[in-house]
Amino acid sequence: VSAINDDFYLILYISSFLIFFALWFSYGRIELTLMSFLPMLVSWVIILGLMGILGIEFNIINIILSTFIFGIGDDFSIFIMDGLQNKYRTGQKVLNSHKTAIFFSAFTTVVGMGALVFAKHPALQSISLISILGMIAVVLVAYTIQPLIFRFFIAGPASKGLPPYTLIGLIRTVLLFLLFFIGCIFLRVLIAVLYLVPVRKSSKQRLVCRLIQITCKGILLLATAVKKEHINKANERFQHPAIIIANHQSFIDILVLLSLSSKILMVTNHWVWHSPFFGAIIRYVDFYYIGEGYEQYMERMRKKVKEGYSIAIFPEGTRTYNGKMKRFHKGAFYLAETLQLDILPILLYGNNKIIAKAQPFNIRKGIIYTEILPRIPADDLSFGPTSQERTKRISAYMKEGYAHICREKNTTDNPAFYEALIQNYIYKGPVVEWYIRIKVKMERNYRLFNRLIPAQGQITDIGWGGGPPSVICCLCFPKTGKF
């Protein structure tokens, strides 16, 4: 009996692998395969758990019957996935009809096999119980878990105009966030140890700031899926204190600024200041919390400026959703006027396409573009004599520079746009996905559009082709109208 049981286990494993690879071949995406296979695996675990709770022995007949239920669960998962994909691909709502068919299929199986519960033989009763419990588990899992996972990772983001999650993207995100958390833990442990070291706090703060810079540089360096471009025409060395201002697009902005120098302190908002991971670190090195007002920190800022530190501020106050620069607040310019410091503008591009504010746990491909503009001396009155005038004029100056960068980088060769284009089609079937991939490659990423299509106008896309020209126009030339 033991040998036969082992053989059935072997058959179960082989059949599971065959089903998995058959689904993978059919869907063409490992993500859809896992979504279809997971309900079968969960229902199998539920069946085994219920058998253990109810004291039903796992004999030869039960193995065969459980495998039969496993196969039915496979069919149910495929039908549910077909309904979900149809709605995602074409908008047709066929899922409810699939659910109805699944319900009646499960109902007839339960009624047919459930009749054996009235049998007097214990083996027949166990067969009946396993059939009833197994089918209920399979139907509930197929009705709930699979649609929830599909909506969370694919349909939900797409309905908000965001790209769906991919397995590669999730792995990339987990690894980089894990690296970030390891760096935070290391710094927190180091700070705890430094409290015991009899050295001036300013010296310990310099060490921690240096390690923060190294950590930020390391994380950006290990983000291999992201291109980095650093422009520093003025050859800025951060040797003299300044008020550093930059447009705010993403969490990456903080890493970029802190990687430039170990002599940069930041003005932070509530969630950064109270973060359970790095809040204690930034408080130790004397970052500043905007919620408590600048006046409270003015003397500490003067002291830090004398030690050679610059102060970095995002004048917009919050991250942008669409990459467009918002209105500048005058706090940074008030500080520059009060502390008599130069203003150092820095333009950031592409960070919101890598980690979007609306989708913070999905790191995508793209470009981290950093351009350090020339310093604006404290006694330079060309931008106005007062902080209010300087706010408006420097804001216009930076927006003009940012618009120039957008014209230069918003092209079909931008890896962020290419990935966004492909991700519009990846879960709509292997034929559609590979047609689009090959089509885009044959068209050389539609580079011709960079010369032909104006910045503003109305574009008519004639022909079917799946619509990639319209998608790439929408991404690269947002001011054009598509029909």
What spans do the regions from the language model cover?
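Conserved alpha-helix/loop element of class I SAM-dependent methyltransferases that forms part
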Residues: 439-456
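Conserved class I S-adenosyl-L-methionine
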Residues: 457-465
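Membrane-embedded transmembrane helical bundles of large multi-pass transporters/channels
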Residues: 1-169
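Short beta-strand element of Class I
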Residues: 480-482
